Amino acid sequence: MRIAILSFDGFNELDSFVALSLLNRVPGWHAMICAPDATVTSMNGVMISAGIRLDTLPDMDAVIVGSGVRTRQLAADAALMARLRLDPSRQLIGAQCSGALLLTTLGLLETVPVCTDATSRPWVEAAGVRVIEAPFHASANIATAGGCMAAHYLAAWMIARGAGEAQARTVIDYVAPVGEKEATVERIMSVVSPFLRA
């Protein structure tokens, strides 16, 4: 499984790096930071090299659209949005927080409930979609998560969809706090599991 973690200048480190780390713990999976340019700088000044560029998006098996401080400007950039070629008929697609605004702009969230963070909610609602007060929601191959600490829900859903629920539990168990492993796995999977059976 090849996965793009779509990150733009001003990206939120939690959204991009938590997903990157969790997804790469699945044997045979390769999650990479995807950006428009060779380097991308986070909202807190962390500069990293992009593993892949936007032109590779159609070749990915899955894509996570992260959030950041410039999302509204990105959504208004028609030329950039035209470069984001996603196909929910064959790709697993997830959006974290304000990343939902980009999926909305692409017309991918028109008929499904959407999760996003409190700051992004007015922008996403203004774009014409229904935002719900929940950390995670998925419909078919598209999922959204709201709140930086909801990144693990998005990753767990993607792992469960692509490699099975047992693998998702294994990955979450590995990174869960000591003394809280069982409770953490059960909490995360209780949120994600209903959307695996829908």
Q: Where are the predicted features?
A:
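Extended, subdomain-level signal for the structured scaffold at the beginning of enzyme domains
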Residues: 1-93, 100-105, 122-123, 127-133, ...
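Structural detector of well-ordered beta-strand residues that form the stable sheet scaffold
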Residues: 93-94, 115, 132, 143
